[in-house]
């Protein structure tokens, strides 16, 4: 059995009139679906370091404090079946007035140069995110469980 790929995913939450989650859509790959910041953990990184890097690379946001670990998703990749362990972490969004923006992915990974349409959406979500990335939202607050999962 192949070694599982180590990954991170970020629930970046802010509180306005109610709780909101940072999500994005690929402008270059519209069929990819709405997602949260996520990606691989490099050999020299721990999940905390990796999630901060991924959030900055994929959204441009930095200074998002990590609140804590939410859980580890052991499901394989939905298309390739490759085993993976995704560490889901809860982060607090920086104080900012931006509700939505376009970001060009930075870094050296395969998504470098892609454009993401980032935005905050109200919780609970009405439907699932790509790859069921919303699976653990209810662990942060049962009221944040995606409506289609109730």
Report residues per predicted region.
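Short, charged/polar surface micro-motifs in flexible loops or helix N-caps
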Residues: 15-19, 29-31, 42-43, 90-98
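Active-site segment of metal-dependent pyrophosphate-handling enzymes
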Residues: 60-106
């Amino acid at each position: 059995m192949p070694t599982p790929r180590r990954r991170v995913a970020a629930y970046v939450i802010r509180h306005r009139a109610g709780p909101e989650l940072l999500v994005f859509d690929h402008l270059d790959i519209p069929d990819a679906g709405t997602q949260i910041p996520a990606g691989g953990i490099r050999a020299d990184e721990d999940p905390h370091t990796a999630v901060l890097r991924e959030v900055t690379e994929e959204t441009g946001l930095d200074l998002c404090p990590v609140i804590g670990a939410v859980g580890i998703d052991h499901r394989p990749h939905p298309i390739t079946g490759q085993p993976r362990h995704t560490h889901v972490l809860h982060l607090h969004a920086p104080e900012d007035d931006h509700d939505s923006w376009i970001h060009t992915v930075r870094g050296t990974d395969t998504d470098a140069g892609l454009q993401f349409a980032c935005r905050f959406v109200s919780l609970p979500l009405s439907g699932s995110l790509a790859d069921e990335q919303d699976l653990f939202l209810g662990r942060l607050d049962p009221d944040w469980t995606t409506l289609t999962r109730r």
